């Protein structure tokens, strides 16, 4: 798997874990979040946890005290598994997740993030602290987008696979006149002045939008488009800040303005952005659709079909929508050995878990229920098979189509099966 797509897969897995953690609520302040930065001394963390354990023995509520002490014990046990802090640091989330009052179900999530952690934090609260990890999901690299014509302008950003509309401007530049002589020349001067003022206003708005990103090192380039020569006049004039002018990657002919114009600008600038993820995603989804429509046998979709293709090493690129939320559930009776394996949504799982209270074969209530994320399982299978993985966003038309028409799971194949 290429470095880029592996990182995408790691971020996708992180996003799913964050979503799971954010749903959990403690009955008291009993959920522990622990962030250990890369390179930090684990013995110091253990010392802090022992001090917290001593303090927690003074908690007045018997239930909360029991749950906090249990969570701290579990965290300390887990840290003993590490000789040193993992390369990118470590985030631990521990606490009682039982929904039944009085019951204890201490669970632990250990996350080695895809990027170095630079935060050291210990927090005991009713919710887990996920903001430092969420910051890793925020796409930093951005491209400035400007569409310009005589009477209208749009300013936007391409950030990851999302096109954001930041600003829309209109002008009072009058149209051309048929009058002759001095009236025409005076009218033309007024028109030129109005155009100049409008261009200045576009530049000011663009400077406000893009300079902060440039200062943070997030602005990778600017693309400018429009239907006529106005865009070239804007580029050649002294309207944009000189540091932003250095970031102009290209000027493109487009027909539309507004939000649709921004989308057209990105589409028409595909050569400039050929390595950008939104262009790569569009090409991959269109390639997948082409194989499906032409029935070439080099595309498949649906969990069972994709799983089989991965098992025999037939997958070239695994496509997973960020909206895909299926889980795999295995229920086993520890008395008679009956077993059931099903795939369902998270919502269906909540209903299923409450309904299956005893074995349908022998009636025993001694059941073991396992649940795991289908997407994470398939990504690991793809890695083992040497397949690429592409996470398809819901921010493009192609991504929406892939999710709605194919359930958000498909594959481009190396060979027919």
Curated annotation (Swiss-Prot):
| InterPro entries to which the protein is assigned, alphabetical | eFR1_2_sf (IPR042226), eRF1_1_Pelota (IPR005140), eRF1_1_sf (IPR024049), eRF1_2 (IPR005141), eRF1_3 (IPR005142), Peptide_chain-rel_aRF1 (IPR020918), Peptide_chain-rel_eRF1/aRF1 (IPR004403), Ribosomal_eL30-like_sf (IPR029064)
Keyword terms: Cytoplasm, Protein biosynthesis
Question: Where in or outside the cell is it found?
Answer: Cytoplasm
Identify a single GO molecular function assigned to this protein.
translation release factor activity, codon specific
Under SMART domains, the record lists: eRF1_1
* Transmembrane residue ranges: none
Q: Name one GO cellular component term.
A: cytoplasm
Q: What is the similarity comment for this entry?
A: Belongs to the eukaryotic release factor 1 family.
Q: Which PANTHER family match?
A: PEPTIDE CHAIN RELEASE FACTOR SUBUNIT 1
Known role: Directs the termination of nascent peptide synthesis (translation) in response to the termination codons UAA, UAG and UGA.
Subunit architecture? Heterodimer of two subunits, one of which binds GTP.
Question: This protein is called what?
Answer: Peptide chain release factor subunit 1
Q: Which gene encodes it?
A: prf1
